């Protein structure tokens, strides 16, 4: 196949980054060992409406980079058969498995990115934990493999002076506006399709940053952060990012903090927890140096006493 033929062939393939988790699950196998499982999901984007999902159980005595590299190659072959191009990046967030996962991803020639911007993966894990695992023999009620929560213990670091911009505001946009984000002029950022089932008039809270002379520099820095979600803690607006980073965006008056926290809570109910960050030179330009859609993910396991189901 010539280079031009390869290019034309790739245009016919679905294109997306991948999101990955490799860890134990709340199931005890017949041999008395915890189940280990590789879970893969493609990231939602505007290139395709499809989602690639792939799972493989790993024997407890083979939890290593050799097994994972082999499994990833199997996943790539299966994805290609189903019409998917090889991903450029694979995101993962499981800190205790970082060495094995990173090595295995790099073994197959793909960039490994430690990030909690794995919203499709969180949805997939939540579905498995609620709908699939409880039906299996050996299921254990309780916490065997904690998924992501926002209870990161480290204190937030203040945003560097150079990236605070000239001004910031807390704002809201409608779901209808957010759905059209793919048509906006955006230099840096990460956006993805919004669920169609959400009412267009529902509002999404977010952070707007302005810098007349350094908006692109700010956007480039934020892009390297892998921003995950905004939250309020002790009258402070916090940005969670990357693997376990926390950034103090600004201090708020108690009244303002409560009002914004209420908006975040309401958005979780009405709009799937969507949030946004935008960076512009001024509030009046119709161009974004940076724009990110975020999602307030907070999944927890069952907290019932541990009990094996047979």
Q: Where are the regions a protein language model picked out?
A:
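Long, charge-rich C-terminal accessory regions
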Residues: 138-256
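Short, basic/hydrophobic alpha-helical segments
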Residues: 65-88
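Electropositive, glycine- and tryptophan-enriched low-complexity nucleic-acid-binding patches
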Residues: 42-58
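Conserved small/polar residues in nucleotide/adenosyl-binding loops
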Residues: 300-306
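An active-site-proximal beta-strand-loop segment
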Residues: 6-47
